Amino acid sequence: MNLAALTAYELIKEENLTDIHAKGYLLRHKKSGAKISLISNDDENKVFYIGFRTPVEDSTGVPHIIEHTVLCGSDKFPVKDPFVELVKGSLNTFLNAMTYPDKTVYPVASCNDKDFANLMDVYLDAVFHPNIYKKEEIFKQEGWHYELEDKDAPVTINGVVYNEMKGAFSSPEGVLDRVVLNSLFPDTTYSNESGGDPEVIPELTYEQYLDFHREFYHPCNSYIYLYGNMDMDEKLEFLDKEYLSHYDKIEVDSAIQLQAPFEKPVTISKPYSIASSESLEDNAYLSYNVAIGTNLESELTLAFDVLDYALLSAPGAPLKQALIDAGIGKDIMGGFDNSTLQPIFSVVAKNANKEDEEKFVGIIEDTLKKIVKDGLNRKSLLAGINSEEFKFREADYGNFPKGLIYGLSCMDSWLYDDDEPFLYLKILDVFAALKEKIETGYFEELIQKYLLDNSHKSYVSIEPEKGLNARLEKELEEKLAAYKKDLSEEEIDKLVEDTKHLKQYQEEPS
């Protein structure tokens, strides 16, 4: 790569990423402030993504709606659904877009040079020059809109994201994941639902949605990633000429804030809906959740991956076994999730009962105290480290290109530190260090410090409620009936007309 000739960019760092047999470069585009990570190696399955840091102040789902809508046509590619066209006609090995609690990412992959260049162009034009400013119908179709078939019909709400999130909000696991995240970080972006809460989505206006895109979809708030065997100089010149050089650097306030630690654990209970024929008994979820350091501490993060295995997944895992022996829940699940700035360690009892919550917490903490005193099973720790190391070395991610998984793991650190994209691609030394620490009491000390002595935790229960969904639907119907009652004749006629117009728009060919 001829960096001297690429005058539009500044080289921030260059690293030999020996763990993945590649060379890594971190660049900054001088004019726009865009950040670019390059991983150069001989992998023909090339990967590109552009991501944006997208914190939210409410649960209207605006980043999720933008993720859907920017892929509904752009300046260069004005067809109504370029995404579907690409799925049908491209040689891609991966093509998608994902909304996370704090970021939105648009990745593509292909082994064909020409196809890869085209995919890059379509996605870049989509995020920077979408048709959303020209056609409000896109927002209505993908986000939400009122529908009125004729003036005597009831008013309803429709929209792709709105309907998708209604489904997500009705599953107990979905409710649990959301409540756990909200419970541990009440003063940050994570206290809101970035995907959208169906009760709140209809509060989002078209103008607020456009404002969010204007604010956050600027190159200086972007994370651009290129991976594989390609002419990097050519790609960087294309990025500069076609997109980045059209922007001047601005300040975007999108930093993800740390949650101040709790003085004492919080207890939260939320309902989820079951059918009237289902039993209330043995149908609750109990969850013990702790915030663990930050994602910029790679050794701590990997050590907790290992602890997750040793405590909850290994044969005879002591924490799981203690809860099963006590008859709490029919299934015990664990999880260490580092997809947020402050990772979360959780223990979940499924098919449990709310009245066992105190006992559930007591057994977890008594068992952890005993483990600290008596020591963890050394074989389980070593097996956990070996398993994580093997997965990393093999880099076999099924249908997902390994360059994509590497790229998403870059975001685990890069999103929170602009100068640190490669933290989780340099971890073989960390695995070696963890093996050395098995006999030193290091893992037991982590349990004491981060699980027992740490008050930044939450106890969450998700309880079954018969007919909850039906009740919520009835409340919505009543609310919409009241809304319609307040409309004038002219407003009702306009809503009927708008409904017809949107249906016509949706039926028009691309």
For each predicted feature, which ranges?
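Short, conserved catalytic-motif segment at the N-terminal edge
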Residues: 44-48
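Short pre-active-site segment immediately N-terminal to the catalytic Zn-binding motif
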Residues: 51-61
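Short acidic-hydrophobic surface loop/beta-edge motif
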Residues: 23-30, 266-277
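Active-site recognition of the HExxH zinc-binding catalytic motif
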Residues: 60-72
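Short, conserved beta-strand segments within well-ordered enzyme catalytic domains
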Residues: 37-39, 49-51, 107
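Charge-rich, well-structured scaffold segments of protease-associated domains
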Residues: 2-7, 55, 69, 73-76, ...
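N- or domain-start disorder-to-order transition segments that initiate the globular core
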Residues: 1-43
